A protein has these predicted regions:
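NAD(P)+-binding Rossmann beta1-loop-alpha1 motif at the extreme N-terminus of oxidoreductases
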Residues: 1-68, 127-130
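Rossmann-fold NAD(P) dinucleotide-binding segment
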Residues: 56-118
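Rossmann-fold dinucleotide-binding core
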Residues: 8-10, 99-147
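Residues in the short beta-alpha loop(s) of Rossmann-like NAD(P)-binding domains
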Residues: 37-39, 72, 142
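Generic preference for hydrophobic
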Residues: 52, 93, 137-139
Length: 147
């Protein structure tokens, strides 16, 4: 995928997600965001060039890579339920949520029938490292998706 064709959607631009979303903008990617709970971060990112979309439908159809950075599995499942009927075939979902033991498997199973790609990628570090762009990550997905 060419950088100009990559339309990244980010859900969860709060405590950890703000710094990650900020770095996506710094690298000149198109960034779509949708309000989850934190308006302050949304407003800052919009001023820096992010596009705030108001509905999950518009968010899903205008993003071919979606990053989900929410607090836990329960919230992640609610987000997926809101998105899944609008996801376009071939969309890549990168889930950096802190899940419970079976959370990522449950999310994967929720998405199986949608012809999208799912990648679990918990990160190591905190908000400061997120803003500096120096988080570590563990990636779990099918090899062809990773490549």
């Amino acid at each position: 995928m060419v950088r100009n064709n990559i339309k990244i959607g980010f859900i969860g631009v709060g405590y950890m997600g703000y710094g990650m979303a900020l770095n996506i903008l710094k690298r000149k990617y198109n960034l779509n965001i949708i309000a989850h709970t934190n308006r302050k971060s949304i407003n800052k990112l919009v001023k820096l060039g992010a596009m705030e979309l108001k509905t999950y439908k518009n968010f899903a159809i205008n993003s071919n890579v979606i990053i989900i950075c929410v607090t836990n599995t329960i919230i992640a499942k609610k987000v997926i339920n809101s998105l899944k009927s609008f996801l376009i075939k071939g969309t890549l979902i990168i889930d950096i949520t802190t899940h419970n033991q079976n959370g990522s498997i449950e999310i994967f199973n929720m998405l199986k029938s949608r012809s999208v790609y799912y990648c679990e990628s918990p990160v190591m570090g905190g908000p400061k490292q997120a803003e500096l762009g120096i988080l570590g990550a563990i990636v779990g997905c099918e090899k062809n998706i990773f490549n």
